Structures are given as C-alpha cells and as structure tokens.
C-alpha cells in the first residue's frame, strides 16, 4: 500500500494540463510517496491467509519502517484498529530512536483519549521524532460502539479544535457540544513543530469535508474514476476557500509493480487466489470504519469493476 500526497506543481493536474485546484505545497518539486506498516496483522503473502512470519509484531512492523526509510520513502502510515497488532502511538514512540529521516503518519481515532492529554502525548512524540510526526485524523467507531456519523464527526471536530488551541495558544478555553474546558495552561503540550504536526484526513460526507477544509492539511482519497477524484478535490477545496485556506491531496493505493502489465495482473491474481468472497467480506466488516461513506463507495466501485477488480 502506498500513500501519495500531490504537492509537486503550481496546481494539482489530472489528465494532461487540466488544472483542478490550488494546493498548499506548490513550491515543492516532488510528491510525498509514503509506505504502510502493517500494525493490524494485515500483511499476507496470500490475501486473507494469515502467515505467522508476517504476523504483526514489533520486530516485523519496525523492520518495515526501517526498510521504507532505507528506500527513501518520505512518510509511513501507522494505522489504528482494534485487531491483533501494535498500538499506534506506542509503536511510533518505539520507532523514534531507530529512524532518522522518515516521517511517521500516526492514525489517531478522535475521542479514544481525553483531548488535552492527547495534545500532550502528540507533543511528546513530536519532540521524540524531532518534528518528523504527522497525524491521520480518524473518525470511525470505537470497538464495541456504534455511533451516528454526525456525532463522530462532531467529536473529531472538537478534538482537532482543542489540539490546535493546545498547540498555538497560551490557554485552552473551549465550549463544545461534547467537551468543555476553561483556563487550562498549554505549557505541557507545546510541540516541536510550530503549530503542531500536519493533519491528514479522509472522509466523504459533508461534515467530513467541512472539518477537513477548515482545520486539516492533507485530504486523503481512495482510487476512483478520475472524474470522481476531481469532484472530491473541488468539493473540499470549496470548503477550504471559505476559510481562506488551501490543502494538499493524497491518494491511498495498493500497487503491484512489474516489468509489464501482464506480469502485474498475473501477480494480482496470484495473491488473491486463495481468498474466499465471504472471508473477504468478513475482513472488511471487522474494521471500525466498515460502515463509513468512503468504504461504501469502495464497495460500489468493486461491483462495477472488471474481472480483475479494477
């Protein structure tokens, strides 16, 4: 799995010279190409067939991080899910002294930790990483919980706004629907990076776009037809423009690289050759974000895909 953040040109372009939306990092000369550490026991030789040698462990997952750094990847996603595997923030802390260049994209499910203590925890990690920390804001359900989408995004909004107060102000004064704080000093939660780590965010619903456009830095998407990706970029950019902001954009993709397309398709068939449809559905449904709008769009895309699944 690879994450690519588009920030290489004056404007993001898809298909020839067509300009889509302005971006924040227009002065950079390369896109951020990132990797993925399989913290949630999802590293398989054959999809859906557990392999003891690839089971999520500190040794296996940290070796992925070190190898990604050796190959020059700029960032690496450390996902979060209630499955057999590694706790995200603990794992990132462990990687601080064994890496030097690669950034860590830590997935944080908003509400799991009290927001002010979360601000301090992230600030501590940011210092341990010497500023090589980025945060993927997650709004999915907690284990054993089913909450309405509107509530989950409101919770994420309030957590993000509290984090920003903690990282940019002298005191936290916050009056939200879920959280209320007054007169708390922010001295314990000052990060290494000015204003805190960059916030990456993915979501397709109107509350998700509003939250990302107002407060986050990178909007993450999944593979879809080009016209749909363009539409999503324009939608979140419209929100950002209301707040006189711009964003960068990222695409989460699974890539199989071979010398020819025929060889790539052959390997794609190989790695799914032992996966049963019912078990694949079970894997998807056990994730905390299985009922999200974005996941439902991916399911729709699978239904209209060709025999190779794309």
Specify the residue positions occupied by each region the protein language model found.
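Aromatic/hydrophobic pocket-lining residues that form the small-molecule binding cavity
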Residues: 57, 61, 88, 118, ...
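Well-ordered beta-strand positions
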Residues: 165, 217-218
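Conserved, mostly hydrophobic/aromatic
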Residues: 72, 95, 125, 163, ...
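An alpha-helical appendage that flanks or caps ligand/catalytic pockets
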Residues: 4-42, 149-192, 224-310
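Acidic (Asp/Glu)-rich catalytic clusters
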Residues: 69-70, 92-100, 122-132, 213-214, ...
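N-terminal beta1-alpha1-beta2 module of alpha/beta enzyme domains
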Residues: 2-99, 175, 192-197
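Hydrophobic faces of well-ordered beta-strands that scaffold small-molecule active sites
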Residues: 31-37, 76-78, 104-107, 133-137, ...
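Acidic-and-aromatic substrate-binding clefts and catalytic sites of carbohydrate-active enzymes
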Residues: 79-87, 111-116, 225-230, 257-259
